[in-house]
Each structure stands twice: as structure tokens, then as C-alpha cells.
Amino acid sequence: MIHQITRAGKSLLAAGCTLSILFASDSYAATALNVSQQPLFLTQGVAPNLLFTLDDSGSMAWAYVPDGISGNSGRAGRSSDYNALYYNPDYAYQVPKKLTLSGDQIIVSDYPVPRFTAAWQDGYAQGSTTNLSNNYRPQWGTGWLGCIDSSCNTGRAYYYTYKVSASCPAQPVSSSNSCYTYNALPTSQESNFAIWYSYYRNRILATKTAANLAFYSLPENVRLTWGALNTCSIGANSRSCQNNALLQFNKQHKINFFNWLANSPASGGTPLHAALDRAGRFLQTNGTAYTTEDGKTYSCRASYHIMMTDGIWNGRNVTPGNLDNQNQTFPDSTLYRPQPPYADSNASSLADLAFKYWTTDLRPSIDNDLKPFMAYKSGDDSKDYWDPRNNPATWQHMVNFTVGLGLSYSLTLNSAPTWTGSTFGNYEELMAGSKAWPSVDNDAAPGNVYDLWHAAINSRGDFFSAESPDSLVQAFNKILTRISERNTSSSKPAMTSALQDDGTGDKLIRYSYQSSFASDKNWAGDLIRYKVESTSTGSTKTQEWSAGALLDNRAPATRNIYIASNSGTNRLKPFTWSNIEGSQLATWLNRNPDKDNQADTKGAQRVDFIRGQQNMDGFRQRQAVLGDIVHSSPAVVGPAQYLTYLANPIEPSGDYGTFKTEADQRSPRVYVGSNDGMLHGFNIKTGVEEFAFIPTAVFEKLNKLTGISYQGGAHQYFVDATPVVSDAFFDGAWHTVLIGTLGAGGRGLFALDVTKPDDVKLLWEYDSSTDSDLGYTFSKPTVARLHSGQWAVVTGNGYGSDNDKAALLLIDLKKGTLIKKLEVQSERGIANGLSTPRLADNNSDGIADYAYAGDLQGNIWRFDLIGNTRNDDPDTNTSINPFKPGDVDPSAFRVSFSGAPLFRARADNNTRQPITAPPTLVRHPSRKGYIVIVGTGKYFEDDDAQADTSRAMTLYGIWDRQTKGESANSTPTIDRNALTAQTMTTEANSTFGSVNRNIRLISQNPVKWYKDGATGTANSDVASYGWRLNLEVNSSKKGEMMIEDMFAAGQVLLLQTLTPNDDPCDSGSTSWTYGLNPYTGGRTSFTVFDLKRAGIVDSGSDYNGSVVSAFQQDGLGGLAITQNEQRQSEACTGDECIIFNPSDKSNGRQTWRVVEEK
């Protein structure tokens, strides 16, 4: 629909405003273009080092945990309530994975399920067997036990359960056999018991299986070496260690690891110091730790050590001293003074050794380019540095993840830090240092167990205390999740807010819906709802649900996934094999993507996979059901969008008030596109997926999702664009309609009626089979009322159409038929396509009058949607000759200025500057016409990942003077020489309060609109037609571009730029957030951003007395504009919200609100 914009100093919904715009967003692609099917901002990356140490001590052969119950092998020892290693009838034991190599392809299968009458005593060796039906004897230490009760003399497998009673306390005890009830194993549990017996019965078997199940899905880009406490040294590359050199975890090296793991023995002591020291020295001395097979050295390679043990360390033969209790200077020049939770009074503990290999630059000869892991941000950089949950180290160092099996019983000292089940569960107590780490020594309990925990903290890792096979699997999985590549997304968050009564009836509660993906997790995606609350130093986010986690735990058959149908009132049918068998879609799904789409008969299985079935043989092994969400921002559908008094005049025959009353009561949804082939609709309160739709335009490549090769370079985009939601009128009633596009996923768009969230209807689909001029649908549509009377979807045709044309498409909202196509002139031989349009309502009557859009050839086009000559006067907002909807025939719609562009964007070297972001409009300060603001840049082809430093991209503000509805047959010749130039004068690093930032200063050159002595306002009187700002600092061209939406908020133009970076030791791109004067393109006269996160914008955020116009800010996908609880304006990325001032009089609480982008 239509939204108003402001002149300087007015509210964004000011009563006297005479210009309205219909918002929309980006676009991309073309047949002559090489449209990337992977996120361009993902560099190949540098594979991390992972060192794995297994405890192979003699106690690993024992069949009980913890050590302290060694004398309690009676009934308690044969109950999982007391001995967590014993068979648990409530747990479904999983067989481990077996990996074999076929050519270059890893084949993953399951180890066989043992027979109950012949279960292997070691499921990996598969030698001796036991008949569990008549010859079962429990294992305790390294030997076997006989039966206790006469009821088990038959020798059938059995277990005991503990029952709480007046004489049997809640905590299971071993002293009273009467508290335990004997259970002969029922027939239904025979297979489960046999799996436990062969693969989990004792510590070494349980550890092997837990590691097996975690490591089989470890990303192949990780580099792995392994070792044990007694029998194998890390990095030895010996045959006895199965050739354990530090290599990428793929092909034969992966097979070697699993073979070594399966054959690891259990004998010897527990020399953890020597093992940790070996790992650290390997990273410090072995040349392969930071080089690749091609000999390149990378300074950003992270290194992690996983050390698993079941016991209390002994054999302390490494004595580093009491390092964590000594003053020292870290490699980044940070001064360390002993402080909690790092320091203690113990000398040469595991914690000291871990501290040594974290604080020491293990390779001082190479640069310190490791990326800090700062998951917890308080707004105080110094506090965040010392937060043990973060890892600020940029130098080469080792992070330890320690795992203790059956050791939680030792973590109970009242005088020591309180163990609550996780490393930082008692975070406040740890940071306060109110309880000291206990003393340690050889075989000392419980101090040596606390030392494992302390060692993880001192190296910025994690400690896991596992008591059962299940918790051991979870521990390994959590470690590998932490090590894996950070999740990221190229979409901005959806921000919603609501007033909540806090006693004053005036507390604004905000929610953020943040999408993400993880390429290293086989393209897993997620959508998370956060509650966002402001603090004195910024804002905090509290997760309320994860849609990805909820989908992983949902039965595929219960999902509501639909495709188009030619029948039925909703024109939708469930996506099941029975509904598509015999169709063209079934033919496409009966193709093997790993064998050049050869026909097979697995279409039904592929349907099951797409619906969410996991662990299917021969198909891709995903780590999550929800696919990657890269460029699609969430769209929230809740109450009605508009005020009744504004909506009713647009459709006098409709009753928006009644519609609004009903819509305000509907169950809210959040919709987002994903590259699993679907548009998803989630319940906004619970995160449960309520609806999903697979567009017809992606049918042909759905089978690719199942391919084993998909993890590599075979990734595809599917529904990779932001849905647009708008209220509109048709069929005699108001509706809420969602328009979906595909981005790089395909050449199509679709419309869904989402008025009733539990009764979604498909209105239509429009794709390249209907219109060959439709390219990849990067252009974000706008829903608008036209002067012809129709409600329409107005969109650019995108890139990659059959003829590489550029055109504005007007599609009937109800029918999906083409109302009008306005094709623009394109230079032949150069790919073209129209980007996202911005629509303008000239007199605020709710009907679109103009559309502005750029194209790939660097032209800015205006489209007249008014018809014949109109005589509105926007300066006074007086409609002299109003038009009613339906007065204009669509044939009167045309390209303005007789088919000529308003402006041609050319760089200083006269090369074309592509325009892929939508324009933004502001009222010209003279009240004559509008300033059309555009930025240049392109970021969707594979080559765009390489920064173009041959020229600078530019921000432009172009004065369109002919906007009164008059015939505009020509426009003045405007080139960059007719524009006032602004420049970036300074780029610097500075600290604001306690926050360190990279910032930029920009010139403040005045724009002289009219010539000196001019007495009129004719074109001949004009001195400048606008402004321009090259995206370069001191003529240094780094490839910075503008590809996202801009926002004109009051007297500030807000935008985010992107600079590609293909250095594997750097992020794939960097982003800068700008706050400019929209009327000059230069520096504002007032401070814009709260750079110091103080909760107020003042001169403390200036640099050397000058207003900062830009700062480097993490997060991709552009900005979301919102307000915090104090009604202060905030610009948000996925990573940070920062307060900004929209005008020189708007510091503090705001009385205006930001209009959401449409």
C-alpha cells in the first residue's frame, strides 16, 4: 500500500505531507549473467584444526560410573537409576555409523544390530558373542558378575528399577536392595538391549559410539588429528595410529579415524597433563598446523582440542608453574592481572597448562588474524574481553573442550564453584570469585575433576560432565557445534513491537525474528524469535523459540506442506507422492541428481526427504530439516496494517473497519522463504510451522536437495527472497495478500491470500513460462491501487530474461494476469533487467502515480501511472483536478520523458554503474519536485565476490522537477557534472566510551540549487541537479557498493553498504552504516548515532569535534528501522541495534514512528 515520506523536521506521518511512497526492495540475474547459487559473502574459509584425545586408560574397560560406586555391584549397580552406564529401558540406543570409501565417495551405513541370541561382546570387533536370552551376565569392572536373585538364574537379560518410597529416598542409594525391583527383559526390548550390550556396555564402548555418532557428520572442511593418553600421539602419522596426520577430514583420512576409534584399547594410567601438553606443543612446533597441502600458510586458522577422560588425572610430568596467578601481557598487548574465574593457588595444574597454550602466541612468525568469538556482548568491550564465554584472542592459540565421563559426583564441594550442569551455569558466582578452585594433585579427588572444568574456562572452551551414553553423545555434538563455522545470514531481522502495561501503560516490547544459515551444517537454516530489551549500554536479546529446532523434532507426516492444485477452493493440495504420482513433478523427482539426473524410481523417497525425513540411505545427510535462509527476511502477518480512516477512501465500497476488527483477532504468523524449496509460515507465538508452500517454478530442481553432492558446489537457491504482505481489496472485501518471489531461485512469483491464517489460498502463480521477459525475481514487488481501478502487483522484471530486457510489470492482484508491461530502452549486447521499483503517490489519495526504478545498465527510470495530463499541485496538496480509480485506461501508463531515463549513472571513468537497490524519495527543500536517491552496485553473479577496484560506486541524489502530474515529454540532460560532489574525508579507528569502532567523516558541501541572481524556477535557473558521493576514501577504491534499501527518516538518510572480500582470513564482506543529509548527500549538522552505546546521542559520539557519518557495523542484508522501549529510533542489523537521531531536535524520546518498509 502507500506510505508517506517527510520534508525536513516533520514527522514521518506528518499531517501536511504531500508525497507518499509504496515501499519495495532489491533484485538481481540474467541468462547472459552467471547468477551465483551460493552466498557470495561466504569465502572458502580456512579449515580449523581439531585435535582429539581419547582416554584409553584401564578404567575405560569398567562398566559403571562413577568410580566411587566400585563396591556397589549389587542390585544398584544393575540399575541405570544408580549406575548410569547400565541398560536404560527408557532410552533408544542407536547403532554407530560405519564408513566405507567407494572411489572418492564416503558411504555411510549403520553397524549391524546384534542378534539377541548372539550379541557381540564388542560390536566393533564382532568376535565373541553372548546369548542374552539364557547366558547373560552383567559386566562390572573388567570381568563378569553372576546372578544375585533366584529369579534371574535362567540367565535372561534383566535390569533393576529404583522406586522412591518412605524408606527409599529420592536420590538412589546402594545400601538397600529392597528399593530395587527386578525386571526380566521383555521381548519388545531385545534389540535395544542387544545394541546396548554390544556398543554401550562399558566406558570404552560407550565413548567410541558417542564419538562415532558425533564425528560422522563433522564437516569435511575441518582438519583432524587424533591420539590417546597411552597408545597414540597426536599427529604421529604412524600405522599404529591409523596414519593420524593433521589432514582434512575427508576420504581415506576420515575412514582412518573411524577405524582407529573402533579399535582403540583400554589399558594404562590417566596422564592428562602429558596429553594436553602434546597437543599444545604440536600446534607450537609442527609446520603442518597452519599450512595446507599446497603449502600456503594461513594466519587465521583456529585450533581446538577435545580431551575426553573417565578419571582423575595422575602422572603430572609437565610443570608450567602457576601461570594463571601471575601478571602477564597477552600477545595483543592486553595486561592480565590474576582475576576470577581464571586464577587459583594451584601450581602446574591442567588449568595452568591450558592457560599457557591460550595466552601464548603459538606461531609468532605469522600475523594474528584469528577472528574473535564474542557471543556475549554487554556493550562494554573491556567486560566482554574478560567474559570467559567469549574468546577475544586473535593470536594463534589452543582452545580446550574437556569431557568427563561419570565425574559429576565429585563436583559437590561447598567451598568450590557450584556445578549446575554446564560450564557457565553459575556465571555470576564464577565472575565474582566468591568460591575458590580446590587444590589438585596426583589422583586427587575431587580437585582434579574441578581442574578439568577450570582448564576449559582458562582456554575459553567448555567442560562437559557426562553421566550416561546419551549425555556423552550430546556432549560431543555440542562441542562440534561450537567448533563449526559461525551461523550467518544475508537478511535483516523482522522487528515487531507492542505496548505492554508496566504500571504506566507505556512500555514498548519488541520482538526480532532473525533468520540464519550454516553452510558447514549441510545448509541448515533457522528462524529464531528474540525478545529485545534495551539496556543502558545497548540492548539484550532473549531467545523465545527456534523454528529449526522445533521442525527437527516434528514428524514429517504431520507437516502442512502444499503445492498448487487446479481444483478446490484454496487451489492447494498436500505435497505427497499420492498427489503427484504420474505428474511432471513426479518425473522430475524420479531423477538422481548425483548421476546427471538419470531416471530412477526413488521419487516417493525424495518426497519423504523434502518433507523432512532424516537419515535416508543414498541421500544427503542433513543436520537440520529447515533449509538455509540466506536472502529472505521474515515478514510478520498480524493485525490489519492500516488505519481505517486512511484505507476507506481508497475503496469507498469496502468496510476496512470491520476487516480490521477481524484481522486484529487472528493468530499471527511470520513467513520466510527458505532454500529447502518452500515458503514457510510459523506461528508467531510458538514457532511451530503451520503452513508451507512449494512454488511450481522450483519443481524441476527439487530433486537436487536430496543429492549427496549438494553439500559441495551443488547448492541451489529456491525461495530466496523476502515475501511482501499487504492488505488489498477485491471480490467485494478486504484481504491480506502475500506476494512471494524467488530471488536467484527461479523466474517466478506467486500470490497467497493469507487473510485467514488457517485457511490460506493460492491466488495465482506467474512465471517465465507465462512471460519470457520475466527474469530471476530479485525485484521486490509492491501492492498498489492503480488509476485504472485495479489492485496490482508492481514489480521489476528482474534479471536473466530470455531477451535480457528491462521492464516494469503491472500484474492484476486477484487474477495474476498482466495489466501492462512498460519496457524501457536497453543497449543491445549488454544484459539488462529492471530492479525493485519505488512507487509514489503524488497527492496522498492512496493511488500510485509514479514508479521509479534502476536497471543493470545504470539507468534511473520513471514511469507515469497517472494517464493524461494531471493538474495536481503538490506544493499545496490541493487536488485541482482529482482522478477517480477507473478513470484511466492502463494503455495510458507509460515510460516518462518519452522513454528517456531520468539519469544515467556513470563512474568517474565513464563506465556504467549498475543499480540493483530501490530508490528512496524525499521532498525537495524548495517544495518543487523530489530528490530521487539511488546507490549503485551489483552483487549476485559469481564474479561479484571479487571486489571491483577499477572504479568507485556512487550514491546519487537526483532532482526530479516535473512531478505535478503534467506531461513530461523530456527531462534536462543530467550527468554527474551537474551534481554537487561530496567526499569521504577521513577513515579512522576510535574509541567511543568503551566501544571501539571504525568510523568515517564526510564532507558538508552545500548544494546550490539555483544560480546566483535567478529570479525564476525554470530549468535554465538551476545551478545543481542534486548531489553525488563516491564510495571511496581519499580516492582509494575498495569495491564498496550499495545494494540494499535506504531509509529517509526525518533529516537523515540511513543506508548500509557492502564491500566484497575474498581473503579466506577475513569475512566475505564488510558493511558500513551511514547517516547522511538526504538533501546534500553530505554530513549532517547534528550527531546521528549513539556510537558509545550510552542510550543517548550526543557529542560523545563525535570524532575530533566532527559528526561521524558512517561506522563499520557487523551484519548483512541492510537495516531494519525500529524503536526501543524509550521510543528512541534504532537502526538494526542482525547483530546490533544502534540508537540514531532523525533530526537535530529529536534526541531522546520520539513522538514520531518509523513506517515499515513494504
Curated annotation (Swiss-Prot):
Q: What happens when the gene is disrupted?
A: Loss of twitching motility, predesposes to autolysis and impairs the secretion of quinolones and pyocyanine, but on the other hand promotes growth in stationary phase and bacterial survival in murine airway infection models. Has reduced congo red (CR) binding which is a measure of Pel exopolysaccharide (EPS) production, and shows both increased swarming motility and an altered swarming pattern compared to wild-type.
| Chain sites annotated for binding Ca(2+) | 841, 843, 845, 847, 849
* Pfam families registered for this protein in UniProt: T4P_PilY1
Q: Where is the signal peptide?
A: 1-29
User: By its UniProt entry, which SUPFAM superfamilies does this protein fall under?
Assistant: Quinoprotein alcohol dehydrogenase-like
| Main location group | other
Q: Does the keyword Cytoplasm apply?
A: yes
Q: Which GO terms describe its molecular function?
A: calcium ion binding
* Induction, per UniProt: By the swarm surface growth conditions relative to liquid growth conditions. By surface attachment.
Superkingdom assignment: Bacteria
Q: Where in the cell is it found?
A: Fimbrium; Membrane; Cytoplasm, Cytosol
Q: What else is known?
A: Overexpression of PilY1 represses swarming motility in a pilus-independent manner and the repression specifically requires the diguanylate cyclase (DGC) SadC but not other DGCs. Increased c-di-GMP levels upon PilY1 overexpression in surface-grown cells, but only in the presence of SadC.
Entry's family note: Belongs to the PilY1 family.
The record's domain comment reads: Contains a region (residues 173-365) weakly homologous to eukaryotic mechanically sensitive Von Willebrand Factor a (VWFa).
User: What is the protein name stated in its UniProt record?
Assistant: Type IV pilus biogenesis factor PilY1
Native source organism of the sequence: Pseudomonas aeruginosa (strain UCBPP-PA14)
